[in-house]
Amino acid sequence: MACTMFTATFSASQEITRTFDIIWAIEAGLWNLRVAAKKFFEENPNADKKTAKEFLVKGLNVYGLNAKRIANELTWEYEEQYVAELLLTYGIGIFDSWVDGIVDTVLIHSSNNLKKKIKEDLKKGEFQTFESALSQEPLSALAGCFHVSPKRQNQHIDNLRLVYKYFKSCRNCCAHGNHQFTAICEANYNAIKTLTKEDCGINEFPKMVETKAGDPVKLILRGVVVFFDVLILKTILHLEILIADHNGALIISIL
């Protein structure tokens, strides 16, 4: 069991690292394309899309590239927002997959229907149903390490949970809504707008815009990047599970 849980947590951390490897490449490539396209059209204002593509992108069959739009019509803020949405959506997906693996592994005696409910709650940033089900599991050294009792409660975890809820609600507006902040987003923002990095135990607090229901969703890429630290911390906080069966120094060195 411990090996399976370790694998789930390690995989999530590795996936986050791989995501950044690609996201930074996309960000840098988009910026370089934008700069090169601006220069090209300044020197060749009447060039068509095919000519621009052949000049700007060599050795790659990219169909439908509208370099003029990248250079002159779309703002860098728009393009960066788009990358931020991709990063946020993928990051939430990593955490959701981790939740599925952990719940299925730890809650051996819970029904499938209960597990489904617990997964839904955890993915919303709500831990109560998980804690309740965990308390019903037969006691073991492993379960004892995992249970977040008042004595073992990390002082930052509730604030981290609230930050997660805010960004999850923003992601929902992008993935399932009309790209407008909802009342839920506004409420989640108000719950964390005065928090600091010290309140959350992180090196930097995620940057956010003032969030009001009905306003267009706006994400700050740097804020989404820092949010990934929250995802990682939320994962690492649960590594207490593994201490009974794995060397803690090994786990820390891997992460």
PLM-predicted stretches and their roles:
Residues 3, 145, 170-174, 185, ...:
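Generic recognition of cysteine residues
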Residues 160-189:
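Histidine-centered, metal-coordinating catalytic motifs and their short helical/loop contexts
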